[in-house]
Amino acid sequence: MTERKQGRRSAQAAEETKLLIMKTAAKMFCEQGYERVSLRNISEQAGVSHSLIRHHFGSKEKIWHNISDCLHVYFLSYMYKLQESIPADLPSNLILYRFITMLLAQQLVHQQPIQLITDGIRQGDELMDYFFDSNGELEEFVNQLVDTFHRDFPEAELSVWEMKWQMMIFANGAVNLKPFLIETWKHDNASYSQCLLNHWELFNRNMAMRLNVTEEEMLHPETLEDILIELPCEWGCDVQESS
């Protein structure tokens, strides 16, 4: 019995160490870029030995793969929970509208995932091929919502790829063009969080127009946090951007 308990504690300690390494690496990839971060840098920052990192992951690329896998799991969980929070008896255009706009709010507040994706693009095809090859479930999930919308609104022209592209532009622009975002609303003395809300409203109105959502049906939160779904990320991808 004692050996079994010790085994469980050892397994738990190993898992906690892996999460610490991933959390540390993800933060460093966002701040410095994947290319500039070495295993030794991660080792020093995480306070674990270089050999232990190699034992758990083998290479820096494998750490990125593990982070990417966790991102997919988290996004899928978030999307399911988000869908559950939207009343099922709403018209399909409102369900899709709320889903898309609330999902962008999550990406604007919790910016680490989009930072990692952007940095992965800079590193070339190898990292991004892995990311894109892993997201079949995410594609299927979004496609089901769009297919239902098209069934109920056959006259509407909505491309799921264009919709995803717009979401990527809005998420990426706010995160990686932060000085320009702040400059846009500097005459209002807006905080960064208010700038993010203003930025989100541009997307919000665009999607409402595309999905035939009236002004009365639209979401107009006082803060983006008001429309977030609470779902902790075990390795810290839900860290909130400071205002």
Where are these regions (language model features)?
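Helix-turn-helix
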Residues: 20, 28-62, 66
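Amphipathic alpha-helical segments used for helix-helix packing
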Residues: 107-129, 177-183
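Generic hydrophobic, amphipathic alpha-helix propensity
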Residues: 17-26, 42, 67-78
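Amphipathic alpha-helical packing segments from all-alpha helical-bundle domains
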Residues: 76-80, 125-151, 162, 194-201
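Arg/Lys-rich, glycine/proline-spaced intrinsically disordered segments
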Residues: 3-8
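Hydrophobic alpha-helical connector segments
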Residues: 66, 80-113, 152-155, 160-164
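Short alpha-helical scaffolding segments that buttress acidic/His motifs in well-ordered protein cores
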Residues: 100-103, 116-121, 167, 171
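C-terminal peripheral helix-coil segments that are non-catalytic and often amphipathic
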Residues: 2, 147-151, 170-243
